[in-house]
Amino acid sequence: MQSLEIVAIVELVVAAIIAIVVWTIVFIEYRKILRQRKIDRLIDRIREREEDNGNESEGDQEELSALVEMGHHAPWNVDDL
């Protein structure tokens, strides 16, 4: 019975480690999705303001460039040359 208890404890520890790893990956991907949504909203605002008046979107462009410079790469930046 003692070996069965040890195996059960080991299985619980392994299951807990796997759960932590999986939820960490889910959290990281969720943050990526939120950042991408923020970038998409900024792009939409820039496009809308360009249609109205080209000079009003400078603040949004600065915010977008700050996001991209922080490592949040936008999908339209392709450096495969």
From Swiss-Prot:
Residues 53-63 have a biased composition (Acidic residues). One of its GO terms (cellular component) is host cell membrane. Keywords: AIDS, Apoptosis, Host membrane, Host-virus interaction, Inhibition of host innate immune response by virus, Inhibition of host tetherin by virus, Ion channel, Ion transport, Membrane, Phosphoprotein, Transmembrane, Transmembrane helix, Transport, Viral immunoevasion. It comes from the Viruses. GO terms for biological process: receptor catabolic process; symbiont-mediated suppression of host innate immune response; symbiont-mediated suppression of host type I interferon-mediated signaling pathway; symbiont-mediated-mediated suppression of host tetherin activity; viral release from host cell. Residues 1-7 are extracellular. It holds the Pfam family Vpu. It is a single-pass type I membrane protein. The chain crosses the membrane at residues 8-28. It is found in: Host membrane. Residues 29-81 are cytoplasmic. The modification Phosphoserine is found at S57. GO terms for molecular function: CD4 receptor binding; monoatomic cation channel activity. Homopentamer. Interacts with host CD4 and BRTC; these interactions induce proteasomal degradation of CD4. Interacts with host BST2; this interaction leads to the degradation of host BST2. Interacts with host FBXW11. Interacts with host AP1M1; this interaction plays a role in the mistrafficking and subsequent degradation of host BST2. Interacts with host RANBP2; this interaction allows Vpu to down-regulate host BLM sumoylation. Enhances virion budding by targeting host CD4 and Tetherin/BST2 to proteasome degradation. Degradation of CD4 prevents any unwanted premature interactions between viral Env and its host receptor CD4 in the endoplasmic reticulum. Degradation of antiretroviral protein Tetherin/BST2 is important for virion budding, as BST2 tethers new viral particles to the host cell membrane. Mechanistically, Vpu bridges either CD4 or BST2 to BTRC, a substrate recognition subunit of the Skp1/Cullin/F-box protein E3 ubiquitin ligase, induces their ubiquitination and subsequent proteasomal degradation. The N-terminus and transmembrane domains are required for self-oligomerization and proper virion budding, whereas the cytoplasmic domain is required for CD4 degradation. The cytoplasmic domain is composed of 2 amphipathic alpha helix that form a U-shape. Belongs to the HIV-1 VPU protein family. HIV-1 lineages are divided in three main groups, M (for Major), O (for Outlier), and N (for New, or Non-M, Non-O). The vast majority of strains found worldwide belong to the group M. Group O seems to be endemic to and largely confined to Cameroon and neighboring countries in West Central Africa, where these viruses represent a small minority of HIV-1 strains. The group N is represented by a limited number of isolates from Cameroonian persons. The group M is further subdivided in 9 clades or subtypes (A to D, F to H, J and K). This is Protein Vpu. The gene is vpu.
